[in-house]
């Protein structure tokens, strides 16, 4: 399994490169842009600027969300839609140990250098699945929505993992 690290889309290129280098990231997944109020953030440009200081990154996968004009770096950048078109419908599973790392989320850095918090596979998933089901009183056939940002632990837990672990329909 691939350990992932989601970062807040509003970070600067410097903040992004610090986190990429700290966790020794080799692949970045981003989108062409993101909506913030009535503005479009050029996420691909922020990633490109960040990667000037991240020589270990070999691939950037880009989702075309805003359809903003972007530059693709030959040999490194790939559009997700093109990859998905040619992808197999099946994928063999990777058996993971319960203590294997699942993801890294970074602290805000408000009290110093941001620290990468490593979350293990089973402990985190049991907690996220249980708290989603019981705190939000999720029932089969409910439609669920969470306003948090996916780059923070609440969004990670209750936009992604908790709903997936409970088979929830999300908006």
Residues of each region from the PLM?
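Conserved pre-ATP/AMP-binding loop-to-beta segment of ANL
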Residues: 60-63, 73-106, 113, 123, ...
